[in-house]
């Protein structure tokens, strides 16, 4: 729900990462226990003046109007364009529109700073930290409890929550990234953000981790 509302407010696509186990599984949950989210209203055109789809704003989000509205022409252009959507090669205009996009990214990052972008399970200072995403979380939590380790699960990957992540990883000790893929996708992304997990535990035979299997492999890499 949060991803959809932010997508609507900031006029951007939202990608919700899933995996094979989640896609093929069936789960039950208490809908009443879900945290309610406030409606995020989009910046809509007020109906006055000439419509500029890419008008500069402080937040970087331009007023939205839908194609088919009377008196409105909505232009979508994949090339560098001006505020109305017409192609341009004027350097000042191109720079201004690029800076508008950067402001939008900054506004989104500022709003996400209030969102719990990183979840943790277990006590800080355990000396061992398991990083995971997706359906591996449940096996990781159980295996980590047996090993006396802590589990860290990033919930937002872009814009990456640098401050929350760095605060969470203080005193992490030995770190391993557990993933159900062959290339260590999350570990690679973390390295791009300046954090190297150092160890990876990968499984890519199309099956989820079993707790005993994961516990043995974590004990091996943490030894």
Walk through the language-model features, giving the residues of each.
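Flexible, low-complexity linker and terminal segments
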Residues: 4-223
